[in-house]
C-alpha cells in the first residue's frame, strides 16, 4: 500500500529518500546507494543487460504477456548476451563487484526459468560465475526469508549484524 502511494507504477525496485525523492530504476538506485561511477566496461555490460538481455528475458519468462512472441526464439536471442559474457569471463574471469551485482539477478532469473537447459549450455564461465554468486554468503544473507513487513512492525535491518 505504501509503495503504491510513493510509486503508482507498482513495480520494484523503489527507493524513497529522506527528502521525499523517489528513485525507481535499478541502476540509479545502485548509483545512489553505492555512490559509484561506472567504468566504460561496466556501462557497456549494464547497458546491454538493461537494453538487450532483459528485453528478451522478459519475453522468454512471460511470453503470454506479449503478442506474437516465441519463447524459444527469445531464449536464443537472450543467449547471445550470455555467450558474449562467457567470452568476456574466459579472458578475464573476475569482474567488479558492482558489475556482478548488476548482472547477477538477471542471469539468475534466466537460468532458473529452465535450469536443466541452462546447465547444459556451453557457457561454462557464466555457469561458474553464477554458481560462485549463488553460493556466496552475501547472496545467502540477501535471500533470507522474512514475513511481509507491515506498518507498525519492528524495522528489519539489513544485514542483520549491522543493527
What are these regions (language model features)?
Residues 39, 117-122:
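Structural helix-adjacent loops and short alpha-helical linkers that scaffold large soluble proteins
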Residues 1-93:
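GST-like domain detector, emphasizing the conserved glutathione-binding G-site
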Residues 73-81, 121-135:
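Extended, well-ordered alpha-helical scaffold segments
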Residues 34-38, 65, 90, 106-107, ...:
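Hydrophobic/aromatic-lined pockets within catalytic cores
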Residues 87-96, 138-143:
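Surface-exposed helix-capping loop/turn segments at secondary-structure junctions
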Residues 146-163:
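Acidic/histidine-enriched, glycine/proline-rich intrinsically disordered or flexible terminal extensions
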Residues 40-42, 140-150:
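Short, flexible loop/turn segments with low-complexity composition
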Residues 95-119, 127, 133:
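GST superfamily/GST-like fold recognition
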